[in-house]
Amino acid sequence: MPNSSESALPVGRSLLYLIVAGIAWGTAGAAASLIFRVSDMGPLALSFWRCVGGLVLLLGALALRPRRAVARTAGESRGRRTARILGTGIGLNVFQSAYFAAVQDTGLAVGTVVTLGAGPVLIAVGARLTMGERLGRGGLLAAGGALAGLAVLVLGGGAAEVRPLGVILAVVAASGYAAITLLTRWLGRDGGATDALATTTWAFAIGAVGLLPSAAAEGLVPHTGSPMRVVLLLVYVAAVPTALAYALYFAGAAVVRAATVSVIMLLEPVSAALIAVSLLGERLTAAIVLGTLLLLAAVTGLAFAEARTAAVRRREEAAESVAV
């Protein structure tokens, strides 16, 4: 979710923020997997508590930030701000709940790789269908590579490692992520300033309210023999891969090019896969490795294609300004 507000952060610090955010997001699924192992908490209840915890911490961040940061982002109309908050909140609900369900069903490595690999491709296709953005040859090749990677994961993984339902849930999660990004891009086409921190905070509030009925039906308080461990894991999910990671991501994404952000965010599925194998005992088959490489190559291809397109656009704009 890009942030179009201005930032005075140096590029080096912004890159560091994005790297930390990507690695932190990669640990969210690992924490969820541990919660599922030691309790009967479901993905909807976990998403609810993540929204509630993230909301509390982000409200604190809003209260502590300088007033001049608010003044720089006061230009967005109430209608557009409401649409952004509602859309982001609903998208977060779909994204988080489906992602945690995918991790529960098919494991951390596959669930994360499919979600983060399919997301950028769905964004590229969605931008073509809804806003007329050209895919180009690189985009088409990336989409084909992503589909091939998904096919390898589903058809070649084996029932013990890859479950089709989990892959479908991961694609649903990717769709929620893509919808948030496309909405943000569509609303930001006029280049107006937005308050990304406030939008995210109230989106988590919408998410918590929307998830409450289904999470209550699933069971808000899990049965577990290790209640303190579950509480600590929930606090971690709310603090590190939610409040901290989102704050760092928005600060860094305001400075770094979108193509570079896409490549750096590949740290999320990579770190999740490393945690899954080294700490959670998940097994990586040849099919999982091949499917993962195809998905990551597709995202990298999209990022470089976007960088080339942006460079051509800048040269054309520079030529037009000289001609005038």
Which functions belong to the PLM regions below?
Residues 1-49, 54, 94, 98, ...:
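Glycine-/small-residue-enriched transmembrane alpha-helix faces in small-molecule transporters
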Residues 12-17, 45-63, 142-144, 165-172, ...:
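Hydrophobic alpha-helical transmembrane segments of multi-pass integral membrane proteins
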Residues 22, 111-118, 184-208, 242-278:
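Helix-helix packing/entry segments at the starts of transmembrane helices
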Residues 24, 62-110, 115, 124, ...:
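Specific transmembrane alpha-helical segments of multi-pass solute transporters/efflux pumps
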Residues 26, 30, 52, 59, ...:
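Hydrophobic/small/kink-forming positions within alpha-helical transmembrane segments
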Residues 35, 46, 50, 102, ...:
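Hydrophobic/aromatic residues within transmembrane alpha-helices
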Residues 58, 135-156, 174-177, 275, ...:
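Hydrophobic transmembrane alpha-helices of multi-pass small-molecule transport proteins
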Residues 62, 119-144, 270-289:
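C-terminal transmembrane-helix exit sites in multi-pass transporters
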